[in-house]
């Protein structure tokens, strides 16, 4: 957040769309592939004369009427191999105000992570089979203007009222998404 106790309109809009994305992922269930979203101002989408009527009606039903309100536009499913590297190669058109993604991960307590083998494949096997492992779903969003928001749902506590939220819960994914929004060298010239 912005450092003050009162969030800005873009921060509220981002938090709302990230929570909506996470709840949509929850309705789809667990064991889903990562999904990438373009975050676009809803007013911009509604101003598109080529927007189908049924899509416009759906957008209007969730729109708060503000210029800050964001809609999540699903992109192609992503490979889960090296998500941060894939994000580093993305480029978004200027109409996109931000980006978001959902991804599922297995996490373990820090003391268990410290015991993991150094070999990456052996470490994955170790963590995936450890009795202290927990499956989580992350929804992470960032705006070009710098704001970020994350929502984290743990599989053992799979309920909307148990979703953790914060501006930087997953720093590596926040940074990778933010980098995908950086202007391409040709755009800077």
Residue ranges and their predicted role:
Residues 35, 56-57, 96-99, 180-189:
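A contiguous, surface-oriented mixed alpha/beta subdomain in the mid-to-C-terminal portion of proteins
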Residues 22-76:
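N-terminal interaction modules that seed assembly of large macromolecular complexes
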Residues 1-23, 27-30:
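Short N-terminal edge-element motif at the start of the domain
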């Amino acid at each position: 957040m912005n450092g003050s106790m009162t969030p800005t309109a873009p921060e509220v809009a981002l938090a709302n769309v990230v929570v909506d994305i996470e709840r949509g992922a929850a309705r789809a269930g667990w064991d889903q592939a990562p999904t990438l979203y373009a975050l676009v101002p809803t007013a911009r989408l509604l101003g598109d004369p080529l927007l189908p009527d049924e899509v416009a009606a759906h957008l209007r039903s969730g729109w708060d009427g503000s210029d800050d309100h964001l809609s999540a536009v699903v992109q192609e499913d992503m490979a889960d191999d090296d998500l941060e590297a894939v994000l580093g190669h993305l480029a978004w058109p200027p109409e996109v105000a931000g980006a978001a993604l959902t991804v599922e991960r297995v996490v373990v307590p820090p003391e268990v992570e410290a015991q993991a083998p150094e070999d990456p494949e052996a470490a994955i096997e170790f963590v995936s089979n450890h009795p202290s492992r927990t499956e989580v779903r992350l929804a992470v969003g960032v705006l070009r203007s710098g704001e970020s928001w994350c929502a984290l749902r743990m599989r053992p506590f799979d309920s909307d009222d148990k979703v953790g939220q914060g501006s930087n819960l997953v720093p590596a994914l926040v940074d990778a998404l933010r980098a995908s929004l950086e202007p391409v060298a040709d755009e800077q010239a």
